[in-house]
Curated annotation (Swiss-Prot):
Species the sequence originates in: Erwinia amylovora
Keyword field: ATP-binding, Cell inner membrane, Cell membrane, Exopolysaccharide synthesis, Kinase, Membrane, Nucleotide-binding, Transferase, Transmembrane, Transmembrane helix, Tyrosine-protein kinase, Virulence
Topology versus the membrane: Multi-pass membrane protein
Top EC class for this record: transferase
GO molecular-function term, one example from the UniProt record: ATP binding
Protein's recorded name: Putative tyrosine-protein kinase AmsA
Cellular component aspect of the GO annotation: plasma membrane
Amino acid sequence: MKSKIEEPSANGGEAIRFELAHLLGQLLDHRWMIVAVSVLFTLMGTLYSLFATPIYSADAMVQVEQKNANTVLNDISQMMPNAQPASAAEIEIITSRMVLGKTVADLGLDVLVQQDHFPLIGAGLSRIIGQKAQQIAVSRLKVPTLWDKRELSVEVDGPDSYTVSKDGNELFKGKVGQFEQHGDVTMLVNSIEADAGTRFTVSKLNNLQAIKMISNNLVVADMGKDTGVLGLTYSGEDPVQISRVLDQVINNYLYQNIARKSEEAEKSIQFLAQQLPDVRAKLDQAEDKLNVFRRKHDSVDMSLEAKSALDSSVSIQTQLNALTFREAEVSQLFKKDHPTYRALLEKRQTLDEQQKQLNGKISQMPQTQQEIVRLTRDVQAGQEIYMQLLNRQQELNISKASTVGDVRIIDHAETAAKPVAPKSILIVAGSLILGLVVSVGLVLMKALFHHGIDNPEQLEELGLNVYASVPLSEWQRKKDQETLLKRKLDARTDPHNRLLALGNPTDLSIEAIRSLRTSLHFAMMDAQNNILMITGASPGIGKTFVCANLATLVAKTGEKVLFIDGDMRRGYTHELLGAESKTGLSDILSGKLPFNTDLVQRGDYGFDFIARGQVPPNPSELLMNSRMKELVHWASQNYDLVLIDTPPILAVTDASIIGKLAGTSLMVARFETNTVKEVEISYKRFIQNGIDIKGIILNAVVRKSANNYGYGYDYYDYSYQQGEKS
């Protein structure tokens, strides 16, 4: 019981080790592909690092002073799990449209100028060969908003002249420093530092695009928790421009902070600026009335009682006017239910009551004294108010000018001498690693999902005998490539240049077919006849190659061999042997030509050959004709071995018809091309038709590290080395 439990575990471990070894072998087999892909990726990474535009980085530092108020509450809030650092709000302000938008307006960043280069590599190539950078400065640009692409092409004509065009159509010619306006297009070029003929693309960005361009290249980070110090980094292609942009950003941030602090004073100054002209006008009017009254009444003098009432009334009126201006300021900060606002209203009410009492006393004086008191009071009160407003205006101006914000610039923008990107070493190393990952991944994916036969044991597991494993012949592969290059074969090709058994008889593939010849000698002893059918599951697996070379090797032993090309659809054996195909099997079976030995071709290949003939419309019906049986019977009587090359069984039924006439049948499967499932289905189809498949020939075997085991492979190596020594 114990052994039964342990046995699967052992087998499972062995299977895992086999799979790992198999995958490792796949990597070794495809090592040159892995190397090639890795080198390709590395080369691409190297080229990218050479041609990529260098990116520079400027950095600056600002300090935001911490507020001392509510220290305990601030400390408690910072202890909350979702608490944001105090600098988070300042970071948002720096990257806001308020700050960045003013930067765009100050520096004219909504106008983008780019030199035209050859796509992809032009800019990098110019930089590598040391070509001087070409540039023009455009400070003003206005184009119609309805344009799909709000850009113009500018070509330099000379040191101070240029030509502007749109979509290849010239719009106007301009001069440096001159404001050019033509139709809806307005442009001002400040300077040109470029050779004649240099082209530039000048684009007009909307405000949001320009702000986003800055925001994408701007990084603001807290330099430490609760330090209040912020580090700003801005990256771009122009090292001078990025310093200017970053400096302008921090200056605008500083200005908005100061403006926020002095906002109350600014509003008060604006209010006073509106009130002073009215107060001055009322004062002038009051002085004019007093002077007119005195001239009319010959400079009337006031009594002591009138002077006392006048002084009190002026004082009260001055306080009321001051409260009026104070109320105007307070109303912008507080509501009427605020204690400060209520206190102001209560004080006004008290002064109003005092003024009423005083007016009652004045009303008891003579009419002339009343009038002189009233007029004099208006003048003196107006003078007091006017002087108070002037003094207040000066105080507010001084307060505004001396306002210091919470922000302090610690370090102004500085650009590093060396570019921060691209990082050549990292790019090349990353490209190499990526190439390795991609190539290894492709190899492993192919190994996991490709189910082609790569081991004779896979066929033996189906119960089929593997009669031979024929190695892939490099000689034959080169000849096939030459054939593909020529596209059309010469019908009279020398078989020594195409047939492996004649052209290179010491090839390892021929040694394997010799072994097959020996195996067939004993396998066919008990067969009903000497007819050998060789078929396969699919086309392009090397059936004809095996048949032709086997026929040659058997003929060399002195036996009389007949090779019949039974593939009347796509048979090409006549091309391989340099024979004729005008007449052949199809003509015999269709009765177009009476059968005689003249139809049998003979050549330097050593065996007799019947070509496929003209391609018929009904090959299967012809094979079922009695003439086929008569031909096979005649061939069996007159030859020691008859080989019939047939079409693939999974494509057509010809092989199942011919197999009924053959005493021995073999299938050919191609290494890593045919799958086990294809062979299994083909084998079952033959069994259903009552045809016994004697065995399998595994063709085009390539020795691989993934399958570096088995007697067959060692045998080929051994034979090859012995051949070299002998």
